[in-house]
C-alpha cells in the first residue's frame, strides 16, 4: 500500500489517497478489494495493479482494515494512515553559468546579460499571478550582474533594483563557480563585485556554488567577513560521491570559528528532472510526490525543501515562465504539498527561523571530486598556477 503524501482539493474539502498495490502473475483474475469499508472490484492483469481509495483528511494516525479476495482466498491486513505532512517545496530558478560547456565566456556573456533583461520582463508579466506563482529568479553568479551594472541604461538598473528589493530577483555573490585551481588570494579578490552591488544599493547575501562538488574552505571565512550569510551547494553526482544521504542544512565553521549557514542541495537542475519546464503535469506530479516519499523515508527533518532548476534543461539556459504555469496548476489541484516559486535565500531563512535547534555545526574542508579534470587543460592549468605564484611574489615585492 501507499499513502500518497498529498491532500487534493474537492468540492467537499481536502481529500487524501491510499493506493492498494497488487503484483500479479498469471491469467487475468477478478479480485475484490475492501479498504476501510470501501469496496472495489478489479481485474488483476500481469504486473502491477493499483486500486485507489479516497479518504477525508486524516487528523490523527489511524489503522484501517484492508482485505483482498481472489481465486477463492482472502488476504487481510491493516494500513497505517497518518496525517499528510504539510510540505512546502521551493522552486528556485537560475541560469547555470558553465563557461566552455556550450561556448566561451566572450560568446555567452551577451546572452547572460540578456537573460537579466528577460527576467525583469517576466517579473512584469507575472505581477498579477498569485504570489506563489510569480516569476522569481536567482542570478547564480556575480560576473554577469557586475557587467550588467556597467553597460545597461539607468532605467534598466532601476528595474533591477526594484525587483531585488522586492525579493523577486536575488543576486548571488560568487563571481563564478570555482574549482580548486584558484588560490586563496584569487578567491578573496573574486568577491569584489560585492562592493559594487552594495554601492548600487543591491542586497546580496547568498553564495551559489553549482555543478562543483566542493568549495574552498577559505570562503567560509571570507563570506562571514563580507556579510554573506548563506551558501547553497547545487551538487552533481556524476563520477562523484555527494556528502550526506539527503539535502542537509548545517552551520559551516571556518578555521577561525566563524560560521555561515550551508545547504547541501540536490542536483542544480533537480526541478528539471521532475519536468518543471515541461507541460507534462502528470510526470511532474508523480516525480514530486515520489521525491517527498523518499525524503520521508530518509527522515528529512524539515517541512521545507528546495529544488533548483533552469528555464530549459541545459546549462547557460535562458529563464522561462513555464515553471510559473506548472506551480499555478499544482496549487489549483493540491492543498498540500504547497509549491511556490522562490529565490535561493528563502529556504535558509525559513530553516533558520523555525528549526534553529536542529541545525548541526560542521568544521572542515569541502574538497571537490572533479580535480582529475584539470589534466584536460594541462597547459592552461600550468599557466594559471605559475601566474598565481607570480602575483603572490609581486605583491610581496611591492609591499616592501
Identify the function of each model-found stretch:
Residues 1-400:
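Catalytic-domain carbohydrate-binding cleft regions of carbohydrate-active enzymes
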